[in-house]
């Protein structure tokens, strides 16, 4: 079931576009034809992916600081009205430009745990949009101690002439963790926490792209979105110099909710983050977004999206929403850059997983030697425990530039969020640097839409008819001869489809489905679903799409 919400762009409801000061660099955006059948429920084609288990992270000492302490702090804070206790920035750094802020560098030689662990921590100075103080503590042998601000840890360049006069309670804006991802001799950026509850994580051979969030509140709502902040962090010092899992805790706070978080980070080719969270609502909340992530999609291979004066064939950090439902069905929703705010919710129960995926890994499809969109990570969320009923919500926001995150995805619980009732959500998040090797069946590799030809329009007497072309590849499709009687199983809610064809492309070996879509009423929204079947067996994931884009 899909709930569709389409609205005019609402002032104040747009997504927060993470500022790129946290990164190594900035973005340096039917009459039915014989092939058409009613859409049955596709069978489960594989177990939930990826097959992973919670990270065996080292636990703090029984008498030491741990997740229960953060839960207690969050619960105590939720019992009181929200307060922003961050001290104002001193005049010397209160009005820094983006370029000035970028010039303030943490000295690598002063990194926390330098030469003591595989992990090192560098701190971000406050300034520019990152004006809130974040309290960062170190946990050693079970004891937590706040890290006191020291201006000598930073190279201010020409921005601050007398850094020694900055107050010692200035605090920090966030931090980043370094780890030898690529080679044993250099510690690369692994995970960054900077601004609100945003964080970014990398695996091997990946470049920063999309962003994860601790929590989303009322994203896309008419009253405007609320941005909770991670106000406090506790970084657990590794007890073994060769320890390969890092544990940290965080306290989240906002007008509506507080939260306690535990992150266990395991670096690798596919970096894995295990998240445990307990939320304490201060008041009833219209909509919570659990395991939220944001990304950028300006345009892809669809010619209908090429409305920009840009030489690059495609520009995006992610090109689709992928999900595996509680019944085992795999869904693929190509992303779009709509002309007005669009929100879709894919209803489900006990979801196996979802994520924003960068499926296209071919440099020639981007032609951007600076951005390297083919290296952007995909984030996949696998729930731990029973998340019950709810839905994966996809938010797509119009944008004319590739510097803004205009896509969001997250889980929305069906049960209302009520004051005083704690909520528990745990999940695994994976940062993939290449195309995930699931679903195991055929996958959508391209979606193209275009206006019907003049002849088709004349024959149909419908100027709003659209031609859809979908290419599938992978799984059992690759070994099929072109004479095999594959069927495209299609549904069109709000319209009908005609002129359906299925053919194997001789040059690529992929299978192409092509059809016309006619809205039931002129310019009405049409929800489409399609997958390929052979002798009653589903061979592909389910492609889902919405017109108009």
Where are these regions (language model features)?
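Terminal accessory/anchoring regions of large secretory-pathway or extracellular enzymes
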Residues: 42-98, 104-107, 124, 365-549
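A contiguous, surface-exposed recognition patch within enzymatic or periplasmic domains that forms
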Residues: 99, 192-197, 201-208, 286, ...
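Acidic, contiguous internal or C-terminal segments within carbohydrate-active enzymes
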Residues: 250-296
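Solvent-exposed N-terminal domain segments of exported/luminal and surface proteins
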Residues: 62, 66-223
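Extended, loop-rich substrate-binding clefts of extracytoplasmic carbohydrate-active enzymes
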Residues: 209-268, 385-400, 404
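Signal peptide processing junction and immediate N-terminal pro/mature segment
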Residues: 10-44
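Hydrophobic membrane-insertion alpha-helices, especially the h-region
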Residues: 2-12
